[in-house]
Amino acid sequence: MEDLFGRIMLDIEGTSLTNDDRSILSNSQVGGIIFFSRNFESHNQIKGLISEIKSIKENIIFAVDQEGGRVQRFKNDFTLMPSLQDLSKYSDANKIDICKEVAWLNSSELLAVGIDVNFAPVLDLDESSSSIIGNRAFSSSSEEVVKFASSYIDGMHEAGMRSTAKHFPGHGGVIEDSHISLPEDIRSLDDLFNSDLKPYLELVNKIDAVMCAHVLFSNIDKFIPSYSRLWIDEILKNQIGFDGIVFSDDLTMIGAGNDDFFEKAYNSVLAGCDMTLICNNRQEAINAINHFEEMGVEQSNKILRMKKTKHIDWNDLAISERALSVKKHLQNIRS
């Protein structure tokens, strides 16, 4: 039987499943779950929750934002990770490839509890203007971002996790936070190819997935990337040559627009997104699921590519010499 996955990724409210959760998870249009801090208590709890969900549905991927620094959903039991920018500075100062090692440890911990996807690394440039990116980015230099992100992705792959580059084509050049507004970037496509898009061009053969930015590039297209065939089909796939998975960012963010959620979700799929995220609004997620069923949205076998390729047991990881070595470096970064 072909491994088909639904095209909607959604969230759950707490640390255990409700009857409503069990009902919606059984729907064929649901192909992914993203976890937040509210869903997490310990590594044993999240592992048990994932096992329970898998007993309801096998063809589903589990995702989290575990970049490090400001964005780390799982903390208790997990290694506290520094921001990507702190990693790059430490790596340069000490002439060591710490990005690869930290990515390996971060990915290994997530894989050990059943997480398939960490939405990382951030490929945005820190242009000292964005209120939401900042030190989530490796650097302000596209060359530096390529160098450090390449190592980071190598570490993810060694652990058995696929990479997800974000936020395509770039969120670092705008001031506004797309969670609470729609940022507008007036640069030309040539400008972007000479800056923000360079990491995607250089790393296209390493990147497994891309998450789209909720930013309006008004001199390039009237649609944000998640709804844009120009951005996804023409620029990302044809011009850059990307052949991986495309995720929308969360459609409940203000930057995703004011249309009905089922229209936003459907438009993202029409534009070329393989999976669309609807978080923190269960009723609208249900509406989108119903609309997908009415419109005959087909499940996808591409999502299978994002499943983990291997993993190390949690207890074995705890005593791994490699893990202990990485943790020593992390103590130095924090000190």
Predicted regions, residues:
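Glycine-rich anion/phosphate-binding loops
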Residues: 41-48, 90-108, 140-148, 190-194
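Second-shell residues forming the walls of enzyme active-site clefts
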Residues: 10-11, 38-53, 72, 150-157, ...
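Glycine-rich, aromatic-flanked loop segments that form ligand/cofactor-binding clefts
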Residues: 54-82, 99-125, 145, 153-169
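Extended, intrinsically disordered, low-complexity segments
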Residues: 294-335
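N-terminal hydrophobic targeting/anchoring segments and the immediately downstream early-domain regions
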Residues: 1-62, 66, 70-78, 333-335
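Divalent metal-dependent hydrolysis catalytic cores, especially in the metallo-beta-lactamase
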Residues: 32-38, 116-122, 272-276
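Short, acidic/polar
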Residues: 12-27, 98-109, 194-200, 260-267
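Short glycine/serine-rich loop/turn segments
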Residues: 118-140, 169, 173-185
